[in-house]
């Protein structure tokens, strides 16, 4: 210890000796004459840029790594950078990294933070909008997997936000693509979101769930939210199976060129399987899946309606009940559409027969009552006024027009051959349709489309059986429809007037319906009005086709009206345009289609009106082509 003490003293003494001394000049200057080389890692350390708001913009690899970062702020910044890059038109450089990009963005659907989930959905929306469906196809299973995980998550908040992710897919992904990839799986997840499997001896295999932590009203709204998205998914299935009819092959005769026509008719293929041909009960895989959908969904839909349905003494619906009825009726209609498409493809009626046998009476009791006393439904006036657009899309408005018209169509599907004891029920439905026609001027184009669809169900599809029990009300409805069409009360938007025209023409073409409804006496106003359509600036392809069919059937009322308007029609041919015609078709070819109508109408020309018209046209040099063709049509034997 003593030695150490002396050593410390000497050290202290040495410090004292140096105190006040100065270093020689130049020894305290930093040397700067050495050389250095800059270290560069080109792939990792790129120059960072800043946006106009002063936020840092990262390179692609840094962004992809930050999408998986544990910090919410880092993940949110990465999502924002991806959106900014896509909006600036730099989507091409992402093509090679789409797998990592979709993994990172779709994983945000399971994030515990709500803000991060919403940022993820915004980024997914921008990304799907920027990419072509072909580029998304190899990675769509990644998005669908995270969507299904979110829909079945244990946290209600993540389940609820999964509907926002589905909204993005419904908006940005083509319906056929979405239906083909994962619609069937998503439908199962939808059912799990509002119900659970039942483990008792009840006939129904699922029961509705109630979220006790949020109250009954919130549960009703939650189910409505889920069912609206389910309706959109089923709509994609219906749309994807709707076949588009191609244009027919048109061959024009020319004397100086060889003509080639089909000699043999195409062989009609029987697409039925062996079980259907032998009348054995055997569903295909698609039919079995559809059977499962209906078996699980219909009881849930009816139970959901029974929970919010008002008592018999209070027929008015509150807003939640009206919205619930709106989506329930829409879903049931879509299920019927899927069944009809399946049965048309496979030439069978097994599913529809099973559906009517098991659910027709339940539908009648729950939605109409046996005598139709619960129908029609109306909504209570709202205390606070909302925009008409919001009311119309959510609950159908105070008159509940979409719901009531949907119930009319569903009743016709469940009871295609009504019996005499249902006379009061169907008279009630027809009376409601008559009242709706009287309010036609106040209906939107969408409501008029729904009205025409319900008219088709009553006046055409089920008319043969309905004429046996409600002949007089149904005939009055037809007369009101003809009067509304002739007076041009149906809007031309969304093709409403054209659909009414097609419906009336199809009724005329059916000889049994034409006779039962009163024949010429009933349809004279409509048939006499038809030639006036050719005097308008445009005429639809379907309208011209319907006129041709009426001429082929030698309908004398229509041909007489056509002959009477011949001078005006032929003088108007140069200004006439046919909509939805074959692309690139010559204008004269369309004019010839109108002139061909007089090949049939000439049999009523006892006064030689057409021949005088031909002579007048021959005097006009610029119309010689029309005159020659009309002369050939009139003189052809």
PLM regions: where:
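N-terminal "cap/leader" segments of large eukaryotic alpha-helical scaffolds
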Residues: 1-83
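Boundary/linker elements of alpha-helical solenoid repeat scaffolds
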Residues: 35-50, 79-92, 121-133, 167-176, ...
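HEAT/HEAT-like alpha-solenoid repeats
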Residues: 53-64, 89-109, 134-150, 175-198, ...
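Hydrophobic residues within the alpha-helices of tandem HEAT/HEAT-like
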Residues: 67, 81-89, 108-109, 120-131, ...
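Alpha-solenoid helical repeat architecture
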Residues: 67-73, 108-112, 150-154, 194, ...
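Alpha-helical repeat/alpha-solenoid scaffolds of the HEAT/ARM/MIF4G superfamily
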Residues: 179-322
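Long alpha-helical repeat scaffolds
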Residues: 309-637
